[in-house]
Curated annotation (Swiss-Prot):
Disulfide bonds: none annotated. The gene is mic60. Keywords: Coiled coil, Membrane, Mitochondrion, Mitochondrion inner membrane, Transit peptide, Transmembrane, Transmembrane helix. The chain crosses the membrane at residues 67-86. It is a single-pass membrane protein. This is MICOS complex subunit mic60. Residues 1-38 form a transit peptide. It is found in: Mitochondrion inner membrane. GO terms for cellular component: MICOS complex; mitochondrial crista junction; mitochondrion. It comes from Schizosaccharomyces pombe (strain 972 / ATCC 24843). Residues 214-275 form a coiled coil. Component of the mitochondrial contact site and cristae organizing system (MICOS) complex. Belongs to the MICOS complex subunit Mic60 family.
């Protein structure tokens, strides 16, 4: 019992020390301003070493790795067994007796903060299963039963008054209950402090051992405990007052330090500004002087360059004046002489001008006659597109080729005309209209045919084509009828290109039927375009020659 009471007292002393320590830590943390943060050192990054090649590994390195692996496995198993000791009390005893350094390791772990906080080192084991304790408890219970035969089996609970933070209850139990409870190991948690892991809340219930203690000793211990608690409460009040005074003093000193540092900072800022201003002014003066010196050098260089240029210009002007003076003297000499050579030169120049004028007139007359011949031949070709007089047409084509051999575009157009003449006669406007009328009827008949139509289908198309188009409401028939009308209107306006485009927009069968008519239109359009190209090139060449002469 005395041993267990000493354990309780040691727990109370630890409680007081940790209360003092936690109080000072919390007071210092509260006194710090919110801007202050704890400095956290950044971890040094781990730079892995370059791996060695697998081919260069020796037997010693393999043995070293195996040894390290076995060592790590042994340490891991040893640490796991230490952790399991705090879970199973039987394994705790076995580990302490049969494992090397078992007792020392378990004791150190129990006394460390890890044992108190995580492994249950703050629990006090009350093991009443030993035979000596059982014999003592049986003897004491027999004596108590013989002396108290008239008393009841269970006494009333006696409580000792404690301060608000601690109450210990002493309960007398019968021997049968104590025997049952003595066979098990009882673990009770004292409670954990947030910082150290020590118990600060509860006291282990050691009812069996307290039954065997003397009442006077229990009272003495309780009085001592009450006095120690009263002292602790008084110390707590004093500490709270000291803490308040220290907080007030710290705040006052903090304000003084802040004001002092602000004044120092302002003085440093003013001194820095003055220093910067003086440095700026000195640098400004230095740069101004440097810039002025450079400007003076540049001005001197430019002045020398300009002076040399002026001298050169004056010399050039003097030379030109001398040349003009010599020319004027020569002119006066020539005028005064009036020799025959001068008159003969004038006559020669006038004769050359007359020759050039005659040449120009002859060239102009030839060009005009050539243009007249070209225009006449083109008019004849345009009038006689049926080529009734084929020999005359060929003569016209030959004259065109000779007249347009110098112009590439006109020569190309004349070759096109020659190909068209060789291919045969060209249809005129009336013939194209008559052929288009018959073609439009055939195209209209194809609207009622399909790709699989036979003899009866063709008869049906002939009959239906005789009916008016308003009877049919099919969009295909309406579109074909509209396309034919557009082509007819373009043909009446002499727009062969528009009529050909309209027919090409039809489907496959109508395009196949209108192929010959489209080819005839194309030949006529090619002939007309070639004639227009030759006329345009002739007029352009004449205008260019006139412009050159002008």
């Amino acid at each position: 019992m005395n041993r267990q009471l000493r354990t309780v007292k040691s727990c109370f002393s630890l409680q007081k020390t940790h209360q003092y320590r936690s109080f000072w830590i919390q007071s210092s943390l509260r006194a710090l301003p919110p801007d202050v943060k704890q400095n956290k050192t950044e971890p040094i990054p781990f730079v892995p070493k370059p791996e060695e090649g697998s081919s260069n590994k020796s037997n010693s390195s393999k043995f070293r790795k195996r040894f390290l692996l076995l060592f790590l496995l042994g340490i891991t198993g040893y640490s796991c067994s230490v952790v399991y000791c705090f879970k199973d009390p039987n394994f705790y005893d076995y580990f302490a007796e049969h494992t090397p350094f078992g007792k020392q390791v378990l004791y150190n772990v129990e006394q460390s903060w890890i044992g108190y906080k995580y492994l249950g080192g703050n629990r006090i084991k009350v093991d009443d299963s030993s035979p000596k304790l059982k014999q003592n408890s049986n003897n004491i219970s027999k004596k108590q039963n013989s002396s108290r035969n008239d008393d009841t089996k269970v006494k009333k609970d006696t409580t000792i008054e404690r301060p608000e933070s601690l109450v210990v209850e002493i309960v007398d139990l019968p021997s049968e209950v104590t025997k049952d409870t003595a066979e098990e190991s009882v673990w009770k948690d004292i409670g954990l402090d947030q910082e150290t892991g020590l118990s600060v809340t509860a006291i282990p219930i050691i009812t069996e051992t307290l039954d065997h203690a003397h009442e006077q000793e229990i009272k003495d211990q309780s009085l001592r405990f009450e006095s120690s608690l009263n002292e602790a409460n008084e110390l707590h009040g004093k500490l709270s007052k000291i803490q308040q005074e220290q907080e007030h003093l710290f705040e006052q000193r903090l304000r003084e330090k802040v004001s002092e540092m602000e004044s120092k900072l302002e003085a440093l800022l003013i001194a820095r500004d003055e220093k910067w201003q003086s440095a700026f002014e000195s640098e400004k003066l230095r740069l101004q002087k440097l810039h002025e010196a450079r400007l003076q050098q540049e001005l001197f260089k430019l002045a020398s360059v300009f002076e040399s240029k002026l001298k050169n210009e004056l010399t050039e002007q003097a030379i030109t004046l001398e040349k003009l003076h010599l020319q004027s003297i020569k002119a006066q000499v020539e005028q005064e002489r009036g020799s025959r050579l001068g008159r003969l030169q004038e006559l020669r120049n006038s004769f050359q001008q007359l020759q050039e004028l005659v040449r120009v007139v002859l060239h102009e007359n030839g060009r005009v006659t050539r243009l007249v011949d070209v225009s006449n031949t083109l008019d004849d070709l345009n009038k006689d597109m049926r080529f009734h007089k084929l020999s005359e047409v060929r003569q016209h084509v030959n004259t065109l080729k000779e007249a347009t051999k110098d112009d590439e575009l006109a020569a190309l157009a004349s070759r096109v005309i020659e190909k068209i003449v060789d291919s045969g006669p060209i249809l005129d406007k009336e013939e194209l209209q008559t052929k288009f009328d018959t073609l439009s009827k055939e195209i209209y008949k194809t609207c009622f045919l399909t790709t699989e139509s036979g003899f009866f289908g063709h008869l049906k198309s002939i009959i239906l084509s005789q009916l008016p188009a308003a009877v049919f409401k099919s969009p295909d028939i309406v579109s074909v009828k509209k396309t034919l009308e557009d082509a007819r209107s373009h043909l009446l306006k002499d727009d062969l290109d528009g009529s050909v485009r309209a027919l090409l927009s039809l489907s496959q069968w109508p395009r196949a039927l209108s192929r010959d008519w489209i080819n005839a239109c194309r030949r006529r359009m090619e002939l007309q375009q070639a004639i227009e190209i030759i006329k345009a090139s002739a007029t352009l060449s004449s205008q260019l020659e006139d412009a050159q002469q002008a």
